[in-house]
């Protein structure tokens, strides 16, 4: 967690949750929740923690109670987001890259059939690298290779980067890789820039079940994209939903086409909640 960002959030947070409705306080086991996902194959809300925590995939009820804690047979280098496909398989984004120097970026596929296992769960590793990174780390003006956001769509995984370039924090580059085991070079699709400030960092993403709406999360707002052409998700209309609440928001997913789940990390006893947001 970036100390500057934490200080900024603590100074600007309040007891009000703005446009967000609190559903539950997250349990202590998810104090550093970094990814959230739902799908039509389970009634549970799936969540993971940030890097440095146990390699576990948690299944929660809608009131925030842990119903499953699955042990994943892979290191949590820096797990940052969750996604799922129409078959119910879960994908874990192990691509957090604060220093822009990782050479082992990966997405871990957890089979839907293994979600009822009691022992350690094996995964399929989908490794990738960015086509335009050749130094690890690059110079400060080229720190564009961190990521905390992705989703699955039409047999591909779409990854949204997080800029660590001062004055360009709100920029995100969209990349695509095949959703299959192996080593891949990511394909650049397009870019979007919301604002230059640090609280515009993109920290999570999701796509609606019908594929007609995507959402990007930052500390202070949700960006909704509609009317786009095929998979150029930034080609349509972009609508910002201010949250009127600033915290370290780390994860977002669709509950249904007009309702979102959002979570934030607990810091100094503040936040660490599961929220609901209506965007219709």
Predicted regions span which residues?
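Bacterial Sec-dependent N-terminal signal peptides
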Residues: 1-21
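Sequence/structural signature of beta-propeller domains
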Residues: 16-280
């Amino acid at each position: 967690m970036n100390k500057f960002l934490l200080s900024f959030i603590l100074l600007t947070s309040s007891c009000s949750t703005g446009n967000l409705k609190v559903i539950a306080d997250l349990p202590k086991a998810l104090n550093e929740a970094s990814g959230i996902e739902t799908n039509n194959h389970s009634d549970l809300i799936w969540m993971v923690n940030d890097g440095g925590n146990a390699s576990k995939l948690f299944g929660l009820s809608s009131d925030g109670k842990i119903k499953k804690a699955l042990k994943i047979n892979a290191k949590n280098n820096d797990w940052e987001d969750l996604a799922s496909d129409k078959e119910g398989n879960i994908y874990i984004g192990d691509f957090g890259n604060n220093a822009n120097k990782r050479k082992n970026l990966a997405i871990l596929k957890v089979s839907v059939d293994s979600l009822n296992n009691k022992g350690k769960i094996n995964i399929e590793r989908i490794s990738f690298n960015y086509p335009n990174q050749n130094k690890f780390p690059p110079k400060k003006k080229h720190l564009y290779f961190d990521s905390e956001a992705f989703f699955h769509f039409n047999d591909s995984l779409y990854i949204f980067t997080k800029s660590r370039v001062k004055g360009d924090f709100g920029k995100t580059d969209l990349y695509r890789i095949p959703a299959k085991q192996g080593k891949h070079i990511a394909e650049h699709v397009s870019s979007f820039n919301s604002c230059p400030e640090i609280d515009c960092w993109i920290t999570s993403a999701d796509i609606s079940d019908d594929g007609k709406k995507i959402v990007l999360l930052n500390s202070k707002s949700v960006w909704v994209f509609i009317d786009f052409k095929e998979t150029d998700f930034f080609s349509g209309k972009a609508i910002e939903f201010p949250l009127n609440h600033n915290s370290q928001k780390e994860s977002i997913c669709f509950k249904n086409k007009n309702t979102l789940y959002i979570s934030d990390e607990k810091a100094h006893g503040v936040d660490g909640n599961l929220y609901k947001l209506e965007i219709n």
